[in-house]
From Swiss-Prot:
<dbReference type="GO" id="GO:0008033">
    <property type="term" value="P:tRNA processing"/>
</dbReference>
<dbReference type="InterPro" id="IPR024942">
    <property type="entry name" value="Maturase_MatK_N"/>
</dbReference>
<protein>
    <recommendedName>
        <fullName>Maturase K</fullName>
    </recommendedName>
</protein>
<keyword id="KW-0507">mRNA processing</keyword>
<dbReference type="GO" id="GO:0008380">
    <property type="term" value="P:RNA splicing"/>
</dbReference>
<dbReference type="GO" id="GO:0006397">
    <property type="term" value="P:mRNA processing"/>
</dbReference>
<dbReference type="Pfam" id="PF01824">
    <property type="entry name" value="MatK_N"/>
</dbReference>
<comment type="function">
    <text>Usually encoded in the trnK tRNA gene intron. Probably assists in splicing its own and other chloroplast group II introns.</text>
</comment>
<keyword id="KW-0819">tRNA processing</keyword>
<dbReference type="GO" id="GO:0009507">
    <property type="term" value="C:chloroplast"/>
</dbReference>
<dbReference type="GO" id="GO:0003723">
    <property type="term" value="F:RNA binding"/>
</dbReference>
<dbReference type="Pfam" id="PF01348">
    <property type="entry name" value="Intron_maturas2"/>
</dbReference>
<keyword id="KW-0934">Plastid</keyword>
<comment type="similarity">
    <text>Belongs to the intron maturase 2 family. MatK subfamily.</text>
</comment>
<dbReference type="InterPro" id="IPR002866">
    <property type="entry name" value="Maturase_MatK"/>
</dbReference>
<keyword id="KW-0150">Chloroplast</keyword>
<dbReference type="InterPro" id="IPR024937">
    <property type="entry name" value="Domain_X"/>
</dbReference>
Length: 509
């Protein structure tokens, strides 16, 4: 990586913009395949008949064959003679695209490292902690309770492959690399094989996921550059002058710079964007733009976003993909939680001289609840219970050993408790635990051809211990006779920084 960093160091000739020569470096494909820098294990050298000195020729030959369509038709006899020539067309594309994805990520990684290093001495989160899904919720807790309206935005998906190429045009100025990228994309018959939108989020084909995720994230970055567009005062958006986008760190700085620029040149439109309470969050294929402003202000933002995306990406964007909702009157599905802003009334008794009276203090509070009905639906779909929530046995697992069955059920229960540890009300989670525990008991009883009651008498409390969550285990070991106040700590919200994906059962959409 140090060698790559030295190669991409900026100089007077701006040679760091030319990434195409790196495609012919063999260690790039070792990095792409997570094989480290061991040349002997690279995917390009796992074929017999090739040595370490021919990496340049191998990659060049691969690219040549990708362009020569007639060379992809290889007879069985030829493939037996030379296993490397027996690779099919998709393998050629996959090998090169994986290396290409690794290469184009390098400038972004270096830019990200330099951006984070500029914050030395300041209190910021580590970058790997920012990847956690739960790192978003404390931000919402602190800020959303004071806001009024929110724009629920379904990020538009690119309807044409050329949009993805144009998105990278401002980051990668190497024409050869862009031509190769365009060829990769046109290897696919249509966009449906690359990105599908059956769910609110986006799903990618299993092949070359790293490559497609990079393209999609670059495209989303361009969509989010709407705010930067105002600062540039131009219809031609160039994102190269800004660091890597980590919306939880840099968004407020961008808003401050926007206000500073518009205070000089655009006094008339300044009131539209000068909102210190504007907050932005992106998750899955959606984003949220919340503000303390009024409904007309949010409506202006809505039509501005629609017009900008239509003009910049040359595509039709339906206004129905953006909804304006009032936080106090609307509950939204947010990454497996039901989130809302509720008014909690706090009664305070005040006494003045001989007179006493009650004061009602309404306090807004951001709540996160467990969506019990959809979650039970997910359990029913996985055959743990009926649609009404009645536990049933899992016949598919009855051939496993008792320890494996208990471990699987216990792991699912602990994962759900781990993910929903930030819920405001955790009583519904105990219903989920009851369903999984009884389903486990019925599965074991079915295996041993006995009744549930007989099996529970024989197993004792061992089955219960497998379903204890990590928080309950700590409390039970540290405080064997924990008081109600200690269990109140467990009932409070707990956010973890090690959750990088939504549990399959929690992702019920």
């Amino acid at each position: 990586m140090e060698e790559i960093h030295r190669y991409l160091q900026p100089d007077s000739s701006q040679q760091h913009n030319f990434l195409y020569p790196l495609i012919f470096q063999e260690y790039i494909y070792a990095l792409a395949q997570d094989h480290g820098l061991n040349r002997n294990r690279s995917i390009l050298l796992e074929n017999s008949g090739y040595n370490n000195k021919l990496s340049f020729l191998i990659v060049k030959r691969l690219i040549t064959r990708m362009y020569q369509q007639n060379h992809f038709i290889i007879s069985t006899n030829d493939s037996n003679k030379n296993p490397f020539l027996g690779c099919n067309k998709s393998l050629y594309s996959q090998m090169i695209s994986e290396g290409f994805a690794c290469i184009v990520e390098i400038p972004f990684s270096i830019r990200l490292i330099s951006s984070l290093s500029s914050f030395e001495g300041k209190k910021i989160f580590k970058s790997h902690n920012l990847r956690s899904i739960h790192s978003t919720f404390p931000f919402l807790e602190d800020n959303f309770a004071h806001l009024n309206y929110v724009l629920d935005i379904l990020i538009p998906y690119p309807v044409h492959l050329e949009i993805l190429v144009q998105t990278l045009r401002y980051w990668v100025k190497d024409a050869s690399s862009l031509h190769l990228l365009r060829f990769f994309l046109h290897e696919y018959c249509n966009l449906n094989s690359l990105i599908t939108s059956k769910k609110p989020g986006y799903s990618f084909s299993k092949k070359n996921q790293r490559f497609f995720f990079f393209l999609y994230n670059s495209y989303v970055y361009e969509c989010e550059s709407t705010f930067v567009f105002l600062r540039n005062q131009s219809s031609h958006l160039r994102s190269t002058s800004f660091g890597a986008l980590l919306e939880r760190i840099y968004f407020y700085g961008k808003i401050e710079r926007l206000v500073e620029v518009f205070a000089k040149d655009f006094q008339v439109t300044l009131w539209l964007f000068k909102d210190p309470f504007m907050h932005y969050v992106r998750y899955e294929g959606k984003s949220i733009l919340a503000s303390k402003g009024t409904f007309p202000l949010m409506n202006k933002w809505k039509f501005y976003l629609v017009n900008f995306w239509q003009c910049h990406f040359s595509m039709y964007f339906h206004t129905g993909r953006i909804h304006i909702n009032q936080l106090s009157n609307h509950s939204r599905d947010f990454m497996g939680y039901l989130s809302s802003v509720r008014l909690n009334h706090s009664m305070v008794r005040s006494q003045m001289l001989e007179n006493s009276f009650l004061i009602n203090n309404p306090i807004k509070k951001f709540e996160t609840l467990v969506p019990i009905i959809p979650l039970i639906g997910s359990l029913a779909k996985a055959h743990f219970c009926t649609v009404l929530g009645h536990p049933i046995s899992k016949p598919v697992w009855s051939d496993l050993s008792d320890s494996d069955i208990i471990d699987r059920f216990g792991r699912i229960c602990r994962n759900l408790f781990h993910y929903y540890s930030g819920s405001s009300k955790k009583k519904t989670l105990y219903r989920i635990k009851y369903i999984l525990r009884l389903s486990c008991a019925r599965t074991l009883a079915r295996k041993h051809k006995s009744t549930v009651r007989t099996f529970l008498k024989r197993s004792g409390s061992e089955l219960l211990e497998e379903f204890l969550t990590s928080e309950e285990q700590v409390l039970s070991l540290t405080f064997p006779r924990a008081s109600s106040s200690l269990w109140g700590v467990y009932r409070s919200r707990i956010w973890y920084l090690d959750i990088f994906c939504i549990n399959d059962l929690a992702n019920y959409q």
